[in-house]
Structures are given as C-alpha cells and as structure tokens.
Amino acid sequence: MSSKISDIWYTFCPVVCVSHIAQDKGWLKEEFAKDRIKLSHISTLPVKDWQSHFTHKHRQLFRDGGNIPPIWTRSEGVDTKVIGMVWAEGGQAILVRKNSLIKSVKELAGKRIALPRRLPNLIDFRRATAKRGIIMSLKAHGLTPDDVQFVDLPIDIPDIATETQPPERTGWAISPETGWQIPQQPEVEALQNGEVAAIYSFHGREVILEQLGVARIIYNLDKHPDWKYRVNIGYPYICTVNADFAREHPGLVTRWMKVLVRAGMWAKENYAEVVRIMAKATDVPEEVVQKSYSTDFHKHLVPEISERGIEALETEKRFLKEHGFINNDFDVRNWVDRSFLDTAFKEVEVETRQ
C-alpha cells in the first residue's frame, strides 16, 4: 500500500520543454492542489539537494530537460524511468569569427575547434553536447575528428550545485550596446584571440553570438535532413521520474503527464505565448527563440514515446559511453515506460469528448 503524498518537487532545465508551459500557466499546481499536494521547485530545498537535478536522488521528483544528465544518472545505477519526450527543432550551430574567411565546415580541416571542459562537474554535459555536435557537423561534411584539432578550454567553476554552494552561471557577460547577456565567454575569447577557428553553440546562444556580431554561423546542424545527425542533449528532451515513486504512485505520474499533454496541445494554437514562456524559461529575448527554433516548434511539444525516441536515446547513450562520459551501460528500452503517457492520452481523449 502506497503512502499518502503531501509534497512533490520538480526541476526543469532552462530549455524548450513543455513543462515550462504547464508551470507558467499554473496547471501543474492546480492539478495537484485538488489533493492538497504541494508542488515546489528543488531550489526551495537545502543546497545539497539541488544536485538532484543531475543525480535524481530525491525520490518525489519530476525532472524535464536535457537527456545527458538522466542518461548519466541511470548509468550510475539510479532507478529512474523516462515517461515522456519532446523534439525541439533548432539550436545547434558551428560558428567562426565574424571576419573569418572560413565559409563552410569543410574548410575547418586542419583547424582548431574549441571544446569546453568543466573540471568539477559530476557529468560534463556541456562538453558532451559540444563534442557530439562538432563531430556530427564534421561528419555531415565528410570529415572526421582526426581532420581537426580539439582545443580544451578548462572552466574550473561548477555549474552543478555542491554540498554547500549553489551552481554558478559562468561564461556570460553583458553586451554594453544591447544589454543582452553574451554566452560562452571562454569559447568566444578563444575564438576572438585566434586560439581556435570555430566553436559550437546551441539553445539560442548561437543566435545571440551572431546577432551581437561576436561570431558568424557557418552551419546549422538542425537543418540536416537526417534526424540521427541532430541527436544531442535536446533531441529529444526527456521527462524522468524515480522508478519506485512511479510504481507506488502511478496515478500521480499519469496526472502529471496529462497536464503536459494538455499543455502541448494548447501550445499548438498559441505560438506567441509559447515564445514568451520559452524566452522567460531560457533567459533569452523572444526574438532569439523565434530565430533559433523552427517556425512550427510550438506544434511539437506534445509529449510522446516513440521508436525514434528510443533509438535516439540509445544513440546518445552509446556516444557518451564511447567517449568516456559514462562508465556503465544499461538497457534504454527497459528505461523507458510509456504506460503513464498512454493512460494520460486515453483519459484526455475521454475528457475531451465529455
């Protein structure tokens, strides 16, 4: 017999995931308030518990966002379940200096490309994201990693909470002309001083860098026709939950997914509002969201679980294992549990007909 739940915690990456809509509109809190269940962000917990965004050690936690930390967590033996996925089309690019003569990725043969390394991190998801994005961009142009030189850029400040210290948002500066925050300062500095010829950027940062004249996009990986090339931290974004919690409280997990399904359906008809919510969630201007993501990205925020998604997670896991970001293998298909989402869709359909 499951115990009664009075609190649920949540944590969402600052990315384009449907949970931000449900949270912004108050729909999640509204749903669980019916049973006097309080929803709280993990930042309301002691600092040492903030690591749950990456470790998933907090039992009553829903997480939504990039797939690399959850893959790492599962590889470390933490029993979680993937209960939903969304596909954000956009936001992966290779950039060079604004005045560089380089016009295509093919011209990067023999050149140096920046690869950030956050030394204290539990899982260096930014490095993993950049490395896969660069390698797949090279592959799309007939090149391999052996054709370029990766330049490590060590960053010794963690962006994951420690036992006593909150995460720090490092690598950002303020543009005096626009007031916009300039991301990826270590990479930008290496680019501008000639230490490297190119950098990888994603999640709208590439648009900011080009808009501010800091760098120039020479390739958008998200435009590649084969979706397998685009697999990365945000392709797909995934929603995860502690497996024991899900087994003991399947009704609560289903209700959570029902709210996300309805939020995704609402998003299809509300582009401008979705842009506003995502700009706020990702801490960038609205025009950056509009330029970084496809014009119909708001129509692809309904959670799903598909064979494509399972294959994408298997591809990502295999990449992380081959490149030393995770140590242990696991069964992706067994990690994914579609039962909650299937039930959520059925109940939403019935309720819509009433």
PLM regions and their residue ranges:
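Short, low-complexity disordered leader/linker segments with a strong preference
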Residues: 1-6, 351-354
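Short, glycine-/small- and polar/acidic-enriched structural segments
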Residues: 3-163
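Short, solvent-exposed loop/beta-turn-alpha elements that line the ligand-binding surface or hinge
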Residues: 33, 224-229, 300-307
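Short, surface-exposed acidic
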Residues: 34-42, 143-150, 282-294, 327-334
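Pocket-lining segment of extracytoplasmic ligand-binding domains
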Residues: 68, 159, 164-167, 173-279
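Short beta-strand->loop
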Residues: 81-88, 149-153, 214-233, 331
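Secondary-structure end/capping motifs
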Residues: 247-325
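Conserved C-terminal helix/tail region of periplasmic/extracytoplasmic solute-binding proteins
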Residues: 318-354
